[in-house]
Regions:
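Hydrophobic pocket/interface hotspot
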Residues: 15-20, 26, 48, 62, ...
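Short, hydrophobic/aromatic-rich segments at coil-to-beta transitions
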Residues: 41-49, 64-73
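Short acidic, glycine-rich loop/turn motifs
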Residues: 52-54, 74-76
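Beta-strand/loop substructures that line and gate deep hydrophobic ligand-binding cavities in soluble
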Residues: 76-134, 150-152
């Protein structure tokens, strides 16, 4: 079970990689980010701290840092999700795809698999899809205009605003 969103840009792959590898990069394009502080940077083993507009706080632990992006764990001991940031393309056209693989047990405290799946399809998946679509919109906005997004620029979100 996952959600993902993708943006394609007429920009070099290296430009996308440069942005997502910058310390505190979420401050530029994440519409629900209050602040994104660095604990340890860059490369495998990097850790940053994300505070959402609603005050929720998570550490993000990076691993599998490659020439095509990175993977991260968000949520610390609770392990809320694995998130893949994948950059593809060449020197003229490229894309960023972000996939969220949630640890469903942290969202639903019910062991019944049928109820978990129903809850996933009816509530969690639409909420996470809306969230990641907003993040991709912010990324696209920043890459095209080189101006930071403002809080809730593309609308609010029940979980993070």
């Amino acid at each position: 079970m996952y959600v993902e969103s993708k943006v394609e840009l007429n920009l070099p792959k290296s430009k996308i990689l440069d942005l997502i590898r910058q310390p505190g990069n979420l401050n530029k394009y994440h519409p629900f980010c209050k602040k994104n502080d660095i604990i340890s940077w860059p490369g495998n083993g990097s850790v940053d701290h994300l505070e959402y507009l609603n005050g929720m706080k998570f550490n993000r632990e990076f691993y599998n840092w490659t020439d095509s992006g990175y993977d991260l764990r968000i949520g610390g001991k609770r392990n809320m999700a694995i998130v893949n940031w994948v950059v593809e393309g060449d020197e003229s056209r490229s894309s960023l795809r972000i996939r969220i693989n949630p640890n469903i047990k942290n969202y639903i405290q019910i062991e019944n698999r049928l109820i978990q799946r129903l809850f996933w399809f009816l509530y969690i998946k639409p909420m996470l899809q809306s969230y990641i679509n907003h993040v991709i919109k912010g990324f696209n906005h920043f890459m095209k205009t080189e101006t930071n997004v403002i809080q809730n620029q593309f609308g609010t979100h029940r979980w993070f605003s």
